[in-house]
Amino acid sequence: MAKVSAIQKNKSRQKKSQRLHNKRSALKSKIYDKSLSLEQRFSLIIALAQLPRNSSSTRIRNRCELTGRPRGVTRKFGISRNKLRELIGRGLVPGVVKASW
C-alpha cells in the first residue's frame, strides 16, 4: 500500500490539472502562433511559467485505484498487475479468463 500522502498529492495534481487545462492549452496555442511578435510570445511564455507546476498533466502519475501502487498499472483497468492477477484468479473481472492451451 502506498503512502496516503503520495496518493493525496497525486489527486490534488489531477484536480489542478483539470482546473487549469483550458488556460494552459490556450497559452500554449498562442505561444506557437507565428503571427504574433516575439515580445508578445515571450510574455505568453512568462505567463505560462507563472502557472503552478502541479497543473501540468505530465506531473500526474498513474496509480492503482485499489492499492495506490505507482508502477505496473494497466490503463484499461486502472489497477496494478498484482491486483489484476489476483482479481482475475478469483473470477471477479468480467470477460477475462486465465489462458489455457
UniProtKB/Swiss-Prot annotation:
GO molecular function: rRNA binding; structural constituent of ribosome
Keywords per UniProt: Ribonucleoprotein, Ribosomal protein, RNA-binding, rRNA-binding
Family per similarity comment: Belongs to the universal ribosomal protein uS14 family.
Keyword presence, S-adenosyl-L-methionine: no
Function as written in the Swiss-Prot or TrEMBL entry: Binds 16S rRNA, required for the assembly of 30S particles and may also be responsible for determining the conformation of the 16S rRNA at the A site.
Matches recorded under SUPFAM superfamilies: Glucocorticoid receptor-like (DNA-binding domain)
UniProt cross-references to PROSITE patterns, sorted A to Z: RIBOSOMAL_S14
Stretches with biased composition (Basic residues): 10-25
Organism: Rickettsia typhi (strain ATCC VR-144 / Wilmington)
Protein name: Small ribosomal subunit protein uS14
Disulphide-bridged cysteine pairs: none
GO cellular component term of the entry, any: small ribosomal subunit
UniProt cross-references to NCBIfam families, sorted A to Z: PRK08881.1
